[in-house]
Amino acid sequence: MRLTPHEQERLLLSYAAEVARRRQARGLRLNHPEAVALITDHVLEGARDGRTVAELMASGCEVLGRDDVMEGVPEMIADVQVEATFPDGTKLVTVHHPIR
């Protein structure tokens, strides 16, 4: 299987999000990279499903709450920016203050 660097990055991100989901299911609080991976994966998969940029910007804030992450993580993540592929092209989705 031959993947472009972009495809490799997406695959790594998807796997990181899956690891984060497993840890979250075990009751563990997520660290910074895990939280970012989970939010990013939510946006990428939502774009693939045909959701709009506005929908993803709003729903990206509902993926994780303060109780889901380690102390200090919400303050470390001011924005998550994801370049996602939509049916009508690639767009930048910014989720402001994703952990509330």
Swiss-Prot record:
Keyword terms of this UniProt record: Cytoplasm, Hydrolase
CDD domains named among the record's database cross-references: Urease_gamma (cd00390)
UniProt family annotation: Belongs to the urease gamma subunit family.
Organism annotation: Mycobacterium ulcerans (strain Agy99)
Lineage: Bacteria, Bacillati, Actinomycetota, Actinomycetes, Mycobacteriales
Name of the encoding gene: ureA
Name of protein: Urease subunit gamma
Domain of life according to the entry: Bacteria
Predominant subcellular localization, coarse grouping: cytoplasm
Subunit details: Heterotrimer of UreA (gamma), UreB (beta) and UreC (alpha) subunits. Three heterotrimers associate to form the active enzyme.
